[in-house]
């Protein structure tokens, strides 16, 4: 499921990233690779703040739609 469908406080794991090669590369460079745990810190209208590895990142709704996760 897309990370968009998660809520504040959820702990999920990246399953895969979909989209163009450029989008996959950009999200991969940000740490969104299969198997990586992610904590949803804040979600508002699809824009999100997440904790991944030791960083907090803001991602847009468009980016979030490309990140598939699982609980």
Question: Where do the protein language model's features map onto the residues?
Answer:
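Conserved hydrophobic positions within beta-strands
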Residues: 14-17, 38-40
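Short, conserved turn/kink motifs that form compact alpha/beta structural patches or helix kinks used as
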Residues: 18-23, 29
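C-terminal structural segments of small proteins and small subunits
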Residues: 3, 11-12, 25, 41-71
């Amino acid at each position: 499921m897309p990370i968009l469908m998660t809520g504040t406080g959820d702990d999920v794991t990246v399953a895969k990233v979909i989209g163009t090669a450029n989008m996959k590369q950009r999200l991969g460079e940000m740490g969104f690779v299969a198997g990586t745990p992610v904590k949803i810190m804040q979600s508002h209208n699809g824009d999100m703040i997440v904790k991944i590895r030791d960083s907090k990142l803001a991602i847009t709704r468009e980016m979030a739609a490309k990140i598939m996760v699982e609980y």
